[in-house]
Amino acid sequence: MSAEYHNVELRMFDEAQFTCRTLGTGLTVGLRNSKVISVRRDNETVKEIHISSLSNIYRFSQKTVAVCTKKCVGDAVFTTYLLGFDSPGDVRGFLNSSDLLKPLCNENKKETRTSIFDRRTDSWSAVQYFQFYSYISQQQNMMQDYIRTSTYQKAILANASADFRGKVVLDVGAGSGILSFFAIQAGATRVYAVEASNMATHCNSLVQANKLAGRIVVISGKIEEITLPEPVDVIISEPMGYMLYNERMLESYVHARKFLAPHLRQPVKKKQNRRERERLDEDDQSPYVKQLSDSEHSDEVLTDELDCEDIDIEDQVHDGATKLSNKSLPCPGIMFPSVANLYIVPFSDEALFAEQYGKANFWYQQSFHGMDLTALRNAAVTEYFNQPIVDTFDIGICPALPCIHKVDFRTVSESELSSIDIPLNYQITTCSTIHGLAFWFDVGFLGSQRDVWLSTAPTEPLTHWYQVRCLLGTPLFVQEGQSLNGRVVMHANSRQSYDVQIELIVPGSETKIVNSLDLKNPHFRYNGYPPAPPPGSHVRSPTETYYANLCAQQQQQQQMEMQPQTMVNNGNPISLAAAAAAVVGGVGMPNNNSGQINYRNSPVYTMNQATGFLAATGSIPNIVQTIPLAVANDNLLQNQSHSMQLSPQPVNQSSLEFGRFITSNNSQIASSMLRSVNIPSATPVIEPLTNVSGSGIPTNESVYYNPVISSNFGDSCFTMNNVVNPSKNWNSGIHQE
């Protein structure tokens, strides 16, 4: 006797009368000799059901098994028994208790089969994955990524009236539910927030606390396994991992297209549709479309991959967005994000390469506490170079333009995401040594009103995705103008990640460098500091730049410490409160109606930063054309440490505007009211100026002039004369363009 199952109910179905009669409850069921199902009450046999190859056994429901038997081959009458077990586990155990029953169990896969997610994922990997995202601290880490969270909110709210207002939205992998809240802010009627980890409980708590229980419905489960009570109009998610594809969440995001209303599903190639239908099961089908595969109209079934004879998806893609040339085709459903670009570029980083080799050199020791480690040195090198490096870097280490791999989430199939082959072709712009390939991605939210992009590029503010670099096992020296070809092949694995193969080839030679990497095992190298530019990036003396910046900062500090009492307006003292209005209207009086400056006839005031003052009676268009480029906005020289200009440059007179101050990288000119401060300790000297550094000041105009404080470094002279950074009080009330 095999394992026994208790508390079983036995019924017999009468096919002639279409009735079901109960034979007993609280029974014990066991399989004897693999051919007889014995049903007993205590020690009394209630029924023995003989099974053979002529019998049919079905899992009738979650807890019920139907056993159909007949006496001989020619007998057309089946006797059907229904066994009601105490739990689904008892049903599985019973059906697997005999080799004779196992194939019968597998005939009906409706309840015993696994989902698409389970078939492609190791159970231990799924447990770790969902446990990781169930932690509040991890959700906080993502939510505090300002670039990520704010870009999603901007994309959703910027398309609120056209894409979200009055719509039903599906949030795939909702996590804390932050994207669902954004959809509600945009006017969505209802949001289904699907979350497979235990974070679903916390998400529901936030929904209840924010009094949105009727509008945000939290569903605990995998997107591949759940059903929805209605189709949706919009799908939102944050499915990107390191190097875009890690964690294989993109496949779940694409799978969610089956929940879109039928008229919103994007068509794909017919050949893909046929291939997918061969393996199509209930998990793949839309829960709103009746299965018609057994009828003569089976080709009319609407799945998330529709027949489309003349459409070539590759021809539709332009700048990351899909444009349908045939207006009769269904409009694509809104998916945020809609498209993604993966950027791949070679890089040169001798320090990183040496760092990885340095780690492996630990295993060169022949006497580590008396133990010889050298046998593992080669294995250590292989392991360290198989790790993708997650950090950030200066774009200057890349000697070529990146290659771009585009994906459209509205049309791509799940199978296309399981194997990715990306050809590479570069034209080298700088002689360098290539140590590997760098990866980052941008995703686009293509809305009806506005397109919004989220970038993880090294030239953009840092996100929690950073960038990823894959090292080559052997460096490759390339010259300017040389071509470099290769490919990146990514194969999905059951650990929710990818096995990455990179290959670089120098055309016309035998040189070929390859490496294999495990995206599941990255090395997190980011140390919290901004990346330094690569060696050799300075085009002028860093020492001179440093001391010029220091001098400018000191002079600005002296200016801020000054407490002037009066200003001079054509010889008449005025209060500081009236200073801002001194030039309005062209006669030294405020013009409250226009709110702007009539600078054509306005008197000009300039100030020496250190010890004196300079006053001129001319108008602004005739004022200084030569201004030092070391003056920035409110924070002097902020962000200018690498591009500081030490010598003056002429500027365009027509560019002079109030409220604009020049930086070394900005052609907008500092010209807000250059003014004079009467400092008691200063002794003004009145003399005509025929020309001040080519400023073009007329010779018949008098100015108050004091010597300029300057710092000389070789042939360069850094000066702060004639340019000031006005205080907030001075700028108040002045219109800025």
UniProtKB/Swiss-Prot annotation:
PROSITE patterns per UniProt: SAM_MT_PRMT
Please write the reaction equations for the catalytic activity of this protein.
L-arginyl-[protein] + 2 S-adenosyl-L-methionine = N(omega),N(omega)-dimethyl-L-arginyl-[protein] + 2 S-adenosyl-L-homocysteine + 2 H(+)
| Matches recorded under InterPro entries | Arg_MeTrfase (IPR025799), PRMT_dom (IPR055135), SAM-dependent_MTases_sf (IPR029063)
Task: Please give the Gene3D superfamilies that the UniProt record associates with this protein.
Answer: Hnrnp arginine n-methyltransferase1 (2.70.160.11), Vaccinia Virus protein VP39 (3.40.50.150)
| Active site, UniProt feature | 238, 247
Entries under SUPFAM superfamilies matching the protein: S-adenosyl-L-methionine-dependent methyltransferases
Task: Please provide the Gene Ontology terms (biological process) for this protein.
Answer: chromatin remodeling; methylation; regulation of DNA-templated transcription; reproductive structure development; S-adenosylmethionine metabolic process
Where does the chain bind S-adenosyl-L-methionine? 148, 173, 195, 224
Question: Pfam families this protein is in?
Answer: PrmA (PF06325), PRMT_C (PF22528)
Q: Which UniProt keywords apply?
A: Chromatin regulator, Cytoplasm, Methyltransferase, Nucleus, S-adenosyl-L-methionine, Transcription, Transcription regulation, Transferase
Q: What happens when the gene is disrupted?
A: In schistosomula cultivated in vitro, RNAi-mediated knockdown of this protein has no effect on viability or analyzed phenotypes, such as movement, color, tegument integrity or area. In adult in vitro cultivated worms, knockdown causes a significant reduction of 54.9% in egg laying compared to the negative control, but has no effect in the movement of females or males during examined 7-day period. Mice infected by the knockdown schistosomula have a significant reduction in the number of eggs recovered from their livers.
Which residues are in the SAM-dependent MTase PRMT-type domain? 126-503
Region annotated Disordered sits at: 266-300
Q: Does the keyword NAD apply?
A: no
* Disulphide linkage map: none
User: Where does it live in the cell?
Assistant: Cytoplasm; Nucleus
GO MF term set: histone H3R2 methyltransferase activity; histone methyltransferase activity; protein-arginine omega-N asymmetric methyltransferase activity; S-adenosyl-L-methionine binding
EC no. given is 2.1.1.319
What GO CC annotations are associated with the protein?
cytoplasm; nucleus
Q: Which family does it belong to?
A: Belongs to the class I-like SAM-binding methyltransferase superfamily. Protein arginine N-methyltransferase family.
Q: What does this protein do?
A: Methylates (mono- and asymmetric dimethylation) the guanidino nitrogens of arginyl residues in proteins. May methylate histone H3 and activate transcription via chromatin remodeling. Involved in the development of the reproductive organs during worm maturation.
Protein known as: Probable histone-arginine methyltransferase CARM1
